[in-house]
Amino acid sequence: MWHVGKVFALRDETATARTFTLEVGDWPGHVAGQHVDVRLTAPDGYSAVRSYSIASAARSEGRVEITVERLPSGEVSPYLTQELAVGDRLELRGPIGGWFVWRTHQTEPIQLIAGGSGIVPLMAMIRSRASAGSAAPFRLLYSVREPAAVFYRDELQALTNNDEGVSLTYAYTRVAPKDWPRRPGRIDAALITNAAWPSNLGPTCYVCGPTSFVESAAAFLIASGQSPDKIRTERFGPTGDRK
């Protein structure tokens, strides 16, 4: 079913990513980790549809937050990140998805691993945990190119500072802050072993990002002893489409 959302607020996350909040009057509610299809239609009738993860907590009362990273060759993301304005209307379909989700009744340790914009659905999980008052312990391993590429920086910092049940580890692949304890580079088996929950605690692991990132991270998790049936993945293709 297609819904119409009105843009309520906009903010830049990075130089190439923007978050927008939509007011959707007939929104049925969603679960953290789900996504929506967004449809843009040109005056000549041509339409383009892209899928984007929902960033807002499950208890969002008719407001849906989406964060989009601009792709230079994209059809939809340049408009959403550069031209969309408060008061504009967007068509969206959803919520979609039932596997890559976190539900508030889950009490086991949760391991989140994000690559770049793959943080978006994981942020919905973190926010849903907070809004529900859940005591489930969360760990987030967030891989980004450089500090300037971090989404939700201030909110993540505040959450990890004020909630002992949420911990955050950054992995910078190109440029790290001065005196950072780890050289820039991709995540590897050692980092996964050090940052993730021990397998004997039975964590559920959620991994989201580009296809190659997700495949590597999932392989490292399995090699470290994590149960394959406790690893849930969401992949983005070369164009940013979900798989």
PLM region spans:
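Ligand-binding loop in jelly-roll beta-barrel domains
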Residues: 58-64, 104-108, 134
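Conserved beta-strand elements of the Class I
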Residues: 110-113, 206
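Ferredoxin-reductase
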Residues: 1-88, 144-146, 172-175
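Reductase modules of NAD(P)H-dependent flavoproteins
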Residues: 1, 137-243
